[in-house]
């Protein structure tokens, strides 16, 4: 689809008064029919894709935000029957135009959304049955994820590098234009310019949700230079500069947050950046000591509407598993999957629960689960507590989670550890460091095994990305 066509679909879903939908859809179909008749082969493909996507939208989660939103429109909302009627007319038009494959795709994807666990999770949260939202843990494919309820997206050097590799026909010309505009003398500045393009494209897709929810949802995470994880001053300068560029690109306050590393320097960055009203997402973060340090800094200093504290589930569980295997724990592969669960239960109890329930009642930053390795990372993160729980999910893990119907328990986070599991986990030094509130001092965060591994991977990917930007 073209950018113009995407904008048309956004208007239909987010900016159309429910009572005007039938007329707006009819006008859209008429325009597409007229354009199709005189279009080139490539343009016809774009039109057919846009028609199919508009049909899928009607049976997706997207209407929940506006067209079916009673808090905005009272009882004057669209019924599912009205949406289905528009779906049928759009699919019929595709077949009339000879685009049977796109018609079949629209029907198939609409059926997939109907049975999607992720879509069901979003709807349950919108209805108040749970308080858990999910996002796309990938730099591309956001619009398809939004159809299943995604309300945020994350980017990091690895993901941006993957995005340009997967779609070189799109991103290579963008890179070439940025080279011509900025030159190649400052690779970091050029890298940020490219990252901003990825972020802005995603931010525009999520911006209506951000507006509708009063800036509570609809954010894009943008990672600061991972090579500067020890340099607070430089990260702060870069955040301020990038934020200014995002304001210009988006025409107002950016619906973005900065990913800051869970290091000692990162604490200073989180304090300074959130004090300026810019949200953060703490990454390279695996432990209760890190969560306590960052939650406290954000709670004390932040004037931003939203910040997140990501826990990188699999990036902790995997090295814990290595230590358990070395210690002779026979069922280490199963035991390691409970490491993050144990930490998350303690974290939420300590930081999110209100004082009357033994917690600190922090509300300026929300916990976010990421880097999951299987369905358990999702089902054991579901919650209905006072602070929203967020999850970002890799595309392949989205498919895995949706491959069969799953029970979505609003209290899934509190699934009890199997008997003896905590004792086995304690045989891992990495787990003990992560689980105990005083397991590490801030100066140790950067050398913590999962942190060191992740920072190296992010740094290597960042170097590869800058190499492509400047010389590729």
Predicted regions and their residues:
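C-terminal extensions of enzymes
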Residues: 9-20, 24, 28-31, 35-48, ...
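Active-site beta->alpha loop and helix N-cap motifs at the rims of alpha/beta catalytic domains
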Residues: 108, 149-150, 159-265, 462
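N- or domain-start disorder-to-order transition segments that initiate the globular core
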Residues: 85, 89-137
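Conserved, mostly hydrophobic/aromatic
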Residues: 156, 222, 258, 273, ...
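Short, surface-exposed connector motifs at secondary-structure boundaries
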Residues: 248-256, 271-280, 354-363
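Catalytic alpha/beta core domains of metabolic enzymes, predominantly
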Residues: 263, 279-412
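Active-site-adjacent beta->alpha loops and helix N-cap segments on the catalytic face
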Residues: 231-235, 260-274, 287-298
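Phosphate/adenylate-binding glycine loop and adjacent helical scaffold
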Residues: 145
């Amino acid at each position: 689809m073209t950018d113009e066509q995407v904008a048309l679909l956004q208007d239909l879903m987010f900016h159309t008064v429910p009572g005007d939908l039938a007329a707006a859809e009819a006008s859209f179909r008429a325009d597409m029919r007229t354009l199709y008749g005189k279009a080139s082969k490539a343009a016809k493909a774009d039109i057919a894709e846009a028609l199919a996507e508009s049909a899928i939208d009607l049976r997706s989660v997207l209407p929940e935000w506006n067209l079916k939103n009673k808090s905005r429109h009272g009882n004057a909302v669209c019924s599912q029957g009205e949406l289905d009627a528009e779906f049928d007319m759009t699919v019929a038009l595709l077949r009339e135009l000879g685009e049977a494959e796109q018609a079949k795709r629209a029907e198939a994807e609409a059926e997939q959304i109907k049975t999607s666990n992720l879509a069901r999770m979003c709807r349950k949260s919108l209805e108040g049955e749970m308080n858990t939202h999910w996002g796309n843990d990938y730099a591309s494919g956001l619009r398809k994820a939004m159809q299943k309820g995604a309300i945020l997206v994350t980017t990091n050097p690895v993901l941006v590098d993957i995005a340009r590799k997967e779609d070189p026909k799109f991103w290579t010309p963008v890179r070439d234009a940025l080279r011509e505009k900025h030159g190649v003398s400052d690779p970091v500045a050029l890298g940020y310019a490219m990252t901003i393009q990825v972020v802005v494209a995603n931010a525009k897709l999520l911006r209506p949700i951000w507006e509708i929810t009063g800036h509570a949802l609809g954010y894009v995470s943008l990672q600061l230079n991972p090579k500067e994880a020890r340099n607070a001053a430089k990260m702060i300068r870069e955040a301020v500069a990038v934020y200014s560029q995002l304001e210009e690109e988006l025409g107002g306050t950016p619906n973005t947050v900065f990913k800051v590393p869970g290091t000692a320097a990162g604490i200073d960055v989180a304090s300074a950046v959130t004090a300026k009203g810019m949200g953060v997402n703490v990454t390279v973060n695996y432990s209760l000591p890190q969560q306590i340090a960052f939650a406290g800094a954000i709670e004390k200093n932040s004037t931003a509407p939203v910040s997140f504290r990501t826990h990188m589930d699999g990036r902790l569980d995997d090295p814990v598993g290595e230590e358990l295997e070395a210690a002779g724990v026979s069922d280490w592969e199963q035991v390691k999957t409970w490491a993050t669960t144990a930490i998350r239960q303690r974290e939420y109890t300590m930081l999110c629960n209100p004082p009357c329930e033994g917690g600190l009642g922090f509300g300026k930053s929300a916990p976010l689960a990421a880097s999951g390795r299987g369905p358990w990372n999702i089902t054991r993160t579901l919650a209905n507590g006072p602070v929203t729980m967020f999850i970002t999910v890799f595309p392949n893990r989205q498919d895995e989670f949706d491959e069969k119907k799953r029970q979505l328990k609003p209290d899934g986070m509190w699934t009890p550890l199997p008997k003896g599991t905590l004792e086995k986990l304690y045989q891992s030094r990495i787990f003990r460091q992560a689980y105990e509130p005083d397991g590490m001092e801030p100066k140790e965060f950067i050398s913590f095994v999962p942190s060191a591994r992740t920072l190296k991977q992010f740094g290597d990917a960042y170097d590869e990305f800058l190499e492509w930007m400047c010389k590729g």
